């Protein structure tokens, strides 16, 4: 509602605006809300939860794996120890792509063979991270749509398995 009020106020001032101008106003207002609510020092902050577990989920093809590589690089640049878990055991080349990222960034990758249980990979990743005193764990998962019940249930299983090692995991989804 806050964004709608701001847009209405700006539109009232200008009276007649084009759809391009409205688009620009909308982008500016969204940016303002995001920037006002995010302190740069807190962005991607892990707090005191170590290892801080981030479970990366989303639909197919949105860049989850690439984002994990970039987040791993960010956290490593802050001097944190990072580990990646390759729990997307479904997509061909997902594990290979993470291997490239982990080598490029210089972080450890926990993986199993294609078709392995993603919850098992997640558990092994967190167990290894605890044993090696890792600060941040990034777990890649297969793309999924909300209407695919079996894949949504798989996320629940991953969460339950992670919580056997850390009751607060995952800390971010």
What are these regions (language model features)?
Residues 1-89, 94-114, 122-130, 134-141:
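Primarily NTPase-proximal linker/entry elements flanking Walker-type ATP/GTP-binding cores
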Residues 94-96, 146-152:
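Conserved ATPase-coupling elements of RecA-like P-loop NTPase cores
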């Amino acid at each position: 509602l806050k964004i709608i009020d701001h847009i209405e106020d700006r539109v009232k001032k200008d009276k007649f605006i084009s759809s391009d101008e409205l688009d620009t106003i909308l982008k500016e207002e969204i940016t303002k809300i995001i920037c006002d609510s995010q302190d740069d020092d807190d962005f991607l902050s892990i707090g005191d939860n170590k290892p801080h577990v981030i479970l990366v989920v989303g639909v197919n093809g949105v860049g989850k794996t690439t984002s994990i590589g970039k987040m791993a690089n960010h956290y490593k640049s802050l001097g944190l120890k990072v580990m990646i878990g390759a729990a997307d055991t479904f997509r061909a080349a997902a594990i290979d792509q993470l291997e490239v990222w982990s080598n490029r960034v210089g972080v450890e990758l926990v993986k199993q063979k294609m078709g392995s249980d993603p919850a098992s990979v997640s558990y092994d990743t967190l167990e290894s991270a605890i044993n090696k005193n890792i600060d941040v764990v990034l777990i890649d998962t297969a793309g999924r749509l909300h209407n695919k019940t079996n894949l949504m249930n798989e996320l629940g299983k991953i969460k339950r398995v992670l919580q056997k090692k850390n009751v607060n995991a995952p800390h971010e989804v």
